[in-house]
Amino acid sequence: MAKQDYYESLGVAKSADEREIKKAYKRLAMKYHPDRNPGDSEAEAKFKEIKEAYEILIDSQKRAAYDQYGHAAFEQGGMGGSGGGFGGGGADFGDIFGDVFGDIFGGGRRQRASRGSDLRYNMELTLEEAVRGVTKEIRIPALEECDVCHGNGAKPGSSPITCPTCHGNGQVQMRQGFFTVQQACPHCHGRGKIIKDPCVKCHGHGRVEKSKTLSVKIPAGVDTGDRIRLSGEGEAGEHGAPSGDLYVQVQVKAHPIFQREENNLYCEVPINFAMAALGGEIEVPTLDGRVKLKVPAETQTGKLFRMRGKGVKSVRGGAQGDLLCRVVVETPVNLNERQRQLLQELDESFGGPSGERNSPRSKSFFDGVKKFFDDLTR
């Protein structure tokens, strides 16, 4: 089955900048997150699709490769998938194509020890952790430098020796018809060195599989889609080459009370209809504790109250966001006989559902309905 275009998956144009890509991903991730759609396999598949698209398009190098080659750019297995807690690093297109053309036209070169692969770790945070910042310990499996041979692959007391086939060049010349071409040495695989006495622990690879524990400091104000780079904490390189990096991908879990939009927080505050009509004070939650909200008389459902500075301070700096409380007027339930009687008396004092003085919107609505039916009968 053909893969969906990454730009279409996120609903953005090919010219979209990083901010637009992040905003689209955040909106879709909140919509299709498994926590919000338990048991929905279609939502889970969609979530994985947009996550994969985001991880490619937010990385400038991967995005450039995708724009040029499409999905074929990642079919060599180098980019890594989107599942699991961690994944492999990016493909080196210079190595993919350079080896082919180098062998044919004599441009082959001694193969240098490969830098270690980058790793990715998906970290879920609560809203409180994302807003305030947190330090978390994570455990990841990775290829680490062998502590016996210190990465050179040779048994202690010995060293890699010069390849007798290519004499350390890493290349050999071969005649093919009228042409003489250079190819990677089949004996040392282009490294110019061979290990005669391999390390007993890593068997000559210079690396061993280990799990390591890292302490990751998450700065205050991060949001879904943000990525934290830990330099040199990826997999160890081959035979002493530099290690790759670890990328911590942030995913903020849905909150039972608050919703975040950029640096602002939103919440719904239920009030009874008596307070809505008469006004009063009510306690509302913030991430810093409870505060009092003054509700004016004759407040209608849906009205937004802004509490300045009670939102999120962005990790990128700037002013702190606000908390916006949306009032929801609740209809009373489980009424006793006395309450029903009082409500009936109140309704009679209003003059019915279309009372002009006490319900101006209802009056306007019923006048509109009457005009509509009058027009139909003409």
From Swiss-Prot:
Subcellular location: Cytoplasm
GO cellular-component term (any): cytoplasm
Record note on cofactor: Binds 2 Zn(2+) ions per monomer.
UniProt xrefs under InterPro entries: DnaJ (IPR012724), DnaJ_C (IPR002939), DnaJ_domain (IPR001623), DnaJ_domain_CS (IPR018253), HSP40/DnaJ_pept-bd (IPR008971), HSP_DnaJ_Cys-rich_dom (IPR001305), HSP_DnaJ_Cys-rich_dom_sf (IPR036410), J_dom_sf (IPR036869)
Residues forming coiled coils: none
Cofactor (UniProt): Zn(2+)
Zinc finger annotations (CR-type) as residue ranges: 133-211
Protein function: Participates actively in the response to hyperosmotic and heat shock by preventing the aggregation of stress-denatured proteins and by disaggregating proteins, also in an autonomous, DnaK-independent fashion. Unfolded proteins bind initially to DnaJ; upon interaction with the DnaJ-bound protein, DnaK hydrolyzes its bound ATP, resulting in the formation of a stable complex. GrpE releases ADP from DnaK; ATP binding to DnaK triggers the release of the substrate protein, thus completing the reaction cycle.
Subunit structure: Homodimer.
PANTHER family given in the database record: CHAPERONE PROTEIN DNAJ, DNAJ HOMOLOG 1, MITOCHONDRIAL-RELATED
UniProt protein name: Chaperone protein DnaJ
Protein's gene: dnaJ
